[in-house]
C-alpha cells in the first residue's frame, strides 16, 4: 500500500477460474483404507469469476463463460466495477496482459479513480488471492456437477 493512502479506498481486482469437476483435495478414511472419490473427466466450459475486494468484503462480482479477455474485462470495468468507483479510489490489478490493454486505464480514470499495478510475481500483496482460495474451498465442498448447481454454490460462497 502506498504511504499516506486511505486503505478504505483500495479495490483489489482479480479473476479466478471455476469448472464442474471441483473436488476436495484431501479427505479422511478409516485406518488402513484409502479415500476414493469419482471426479468427472469432462468439465464443460470453464467459468471465470472476477471481483473486487475492499475492506468491506467482495463486491462488483461478475461471472462469465470461458476465459477473461480484453473485451470482457472492458465490460467488467464499464458496467460492473465502474459504477462502484468514486473519485479517489485506487484500483489494484496484477500484471495479467488483459489488464494492460490500451484504453483500460482510461475507463478507470474517467471515474476519478486511479490504477495501481502490483509488482510482477507478487500475489502475496493481493488479499483477494486468499479470499478466492477460501471461496473455492467452499465450491470444492459443494461438488457442483451442473452449471445450475455451480451457480447455486457460487451464490452461497459469495454470501
What are these regions (language model features)?
Residues 1-159:
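Short functional hotspots at interaction and active-site rims
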